[in-house]
Amino acid sequence: MVYDELTVQFSVCIFSCLHPVHLCAMWLYSLVLCLAGVRWKSTVQFASRPDLPKLAYKRVKGKSPGVVFLPGYASNMNGQKAEALEEFCRSLGHSILRFDYTGHGASEGVLAEGTIGTWKKDVLFVLDELVEGPQILVGSSIGGWLMLLVAIARPEKTAALVGIATAADHIVTSFKALPLEVRKEFEEKGEWTVPTKHSEEGVYRFSMDFLREAENHCVLQGPIPITCPVRLIHGLKDEDVPWHISMQVAERILSNDVDVILRRQGQHRMSEKDDIKLMVYTIDDLIDKLTTMV
């Protein structure tokens, strides 16, 4: 199968790829410490918003382009990918901001009351109020969907995109793919329960109102008006969000600079050491590309 304008890469030997000149001693030292669990801690801050819950975030100031990390559903800013990314950016002197959506982590609000629109507003607030200049948005799972939405809304604040197991439209399309009688049962209950190994309860619960609201934010029905560089990383063993979604996103994005990187052993969270190295090297390559273009 051939995908025009796309580069499909099966990552095998991570250390051999992407600008070895950047692998300086400080960079490697920082990354090794991070993966070993030794980290410089950034301070949690809280952003107040009129009539909206406070957002918790951690920020390291530095050079442009900066990086903003968008976590997945029911996740937070303290995951392995976010921690590793902060250490990497700190070692290069680039700014990074990671945060919790409304109802997630240390932010105010209730998870069950959140919507795709709610969390899109959170990211827009971060871009408008908490960072300066164009950013590299790194979105994991539902964060990958949100990064697409905000890149469309704020092209001037988006330098590049890195999606990890991008879950564009996935909640909506998965529900619609259920047999009609099964959908009707959930609609009568007013709630869709999705089995998951990522929750203590063993399921995620989505209200019918959540699903209806999410339909307003679907992006795969036509061309996606994004023209910045885009990198989409996905694991072939992802049992939560099929890797084909990243291919669909890549096919629809208008940018000519789109790479899809598939990891043969990669699972949904992409939090193994080699997964994290691939993410970091991908961002390193983008930083080099963007700073060279200036």
What are these regions (language model features)?
Residues 74-86:
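The serine-hydrolase catalytic nucleophile loop
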